[in-house]
Amino acid sequence: MRKIEAKRGLDIECKGWEQEAVLRMLYNNLDPEVAERPEDLVVYGGIGKAARNWEAFEAIEDTLRSLEADETMLVQSGKPVAVFKTHEEAPRVLISNSVLVPEWANWDHFNELDKKGLMMYGQMTAGSWIYIGSQGIVQGTYETFGELANQHFNGKLNGTVTLTAGLGGMGGAQPLAVTMNGGVVIGVDVDETRIDKRIETRYCDVKTHDLDEALRLADEAREKGEPLSIGLVGNAVDTHKAILDKGFKIDIVTDQTSAHDPLNGYVPQGYSLEEAKAIRQKDPKQYVKEAQTSMRKHVELMLEFQKNGAVAFDYGNNIRQVAFNDGLENAFDFPGFVPAYIRPLFCEGKGPFRFAALSGNPKDIERADEEMRKIFPDNEKLIRWLDLAQEKIAFQGLPSRIAWLGYEERAKMGLALNKLVRDGEISAPIVIGRDHLDSGSVASPNRETEGMKDGSDAVGDWAILNALINTAAGGSWISFHHGGGVGMGYSLHAGMVVVADGSERADRRLGRVLTTDPGMGVVRHADAGYESAIKVAKEKGIKIPMITGKGDK
């Protein structure tokens, strides 16, 4: 086991900045500021890992150091398996993580392979080396709660209390996103170290072990209309039931525990962390059974809050499905966050454009933020987001920024960043990527593609086409994963990263990839019959043969 830290500075150890970018982002994923359990190669999301094991990690490092500018490394579930001669505008790395043949696409079979050292769970950005800590999800979370506020609370969350659980790498964005929208939030986590990490990075305001204190603080802040985030140490089933029994009014309820992984992600009611770890190893089948029972109770309690007037929604961890499988027939009585709040953005190709400064210099991100303000001066939501981000977001690992941008906007920003690198206004290359949660890169019937207009929720072709077109367009590293966010059997998804190194070649690649990638979001939703996506496709000249081309019907 080694301690890995994000590498900074202008000296490189690889044969070019593109290979160096891959290495630095791999290191960044495992920096203690970023990763949840770096000693186990776990980045976030239960057992979402950056490499299969330490031997594979070191082989990836060595391969990247010797990789030529016209070669491509292939990574199979966290292990480097080949290097082939390709060409300079091809990806330097192609990654496939946790992909199983459908009949075998379940946790039991995955766990068998994992034990044999044959597979790794890549989550979304853990195994694709573009995780940037909680900031990576916080704007999407901010947008979600902002749209919820628009629909239910006249545009602001002031005077409301949100109840949620799970403050890990993904869920840790919730406290800050709610307070950015003016609300109060109680975030429950059984693992105190996770709450501590959110407080250290300014995502959460206060911590308590005492439910009564949490409710008192929440009520006082609600009465004053002031934002406040409270990390409450406890098990969600226990705390949620106690809150209901006390008759305390909850306005919004959701959840981001690692419910997608009943064995490694969710701690059943009645267990301490230590006890959970022991039984997980001693009797995994019993553990899963107890976790599923707890999740059913958890969803039952969320439904009770909904019955009492709270706005309830699933935040994409598949907890409804687990509860349904455990016999709760009305588990899907509250919606997922994508159909409820995010899909209109997806129809425009909008999604989580993110970038990181390979120099490690925060001034490079400041300059990029300044450029974004110049390019999009009329985008009020974006400007407000940048104001809030600069004030409230602490960088984890390499300095980075996320900003939801749409079709044409991403390419415009990517080319602008490349010019800043070329002109020396940014000191070293920038990597540009995104979460796999995006408009055209996921098939996930209980999350991103829940309730599609044409019933195409489970069609996996789109995620594969996204990876293929971004490879053809010349991304720097492209990934295709199974099971991220919602667990084995429930999702297929693709990721892309492209490096802005200031070169003319990078201009070509950025222009292509940052057009094809959001373009797939517009195409996917236009094909499903969303009028707003069809309108964008026609206005922007996206060629969709049977919608905008000669194949019109």
Swiss-Prot record:
GO terms for cellular component: cytoplasm. One of its GO terms (biological process) is L-histidine catabolic process to glutamate and formate. Keywords: Cytoplasm, Histidine metabolism, Lyase, NAD. Pfam families: Urocanase, Urocanase_C, Urocanase_N. GO terms for molecular function: urocanate hydratase activity. Pathway: Amino-acid degradation; L-histidine degradation into L-glutamate; N-formimidoyl-L-glutamate from L-histidine: step 2/3. Transmembrane segments: none annotated. It is found in: Cytoplasm. It catalyses: 4-imidazolone-5-propanoate = trans-urocanate + H2O. Its EC number is 4.2.1.49. It comes from the Bacteria. InterPro entries: Urocanase, Urocanase-like, Urocanase_C, Urocanase_central_sf, Urocanase_CS, Urocanase_N, Urocanase_Rossmann-like, Urocanase_sf. The keyword Cytoplasm applies. The keyword Transmembrane helix does not apply. NAD(+) binds at residues 45-46, 123, 169-171, 189, 194, 235-236, 256-260, 266-267, 315, 485. Binds 1 NAD(+) per subunit. Its cofactor is NAD(+). Catalyzes the conversion of urocanate to 4-imidazolone-5-propionate. This is Urocanate hydratase. It comes from Staphylococcus saprophyticus subsp. saprophyticus (strain ATCC 15305 / DSM 20229 / NCIMB 8711 / NCTC 7292 / S-41). The lineage of its organism: Bacteria, Bacillati, Bacillota, Bacilli, Bacillales.
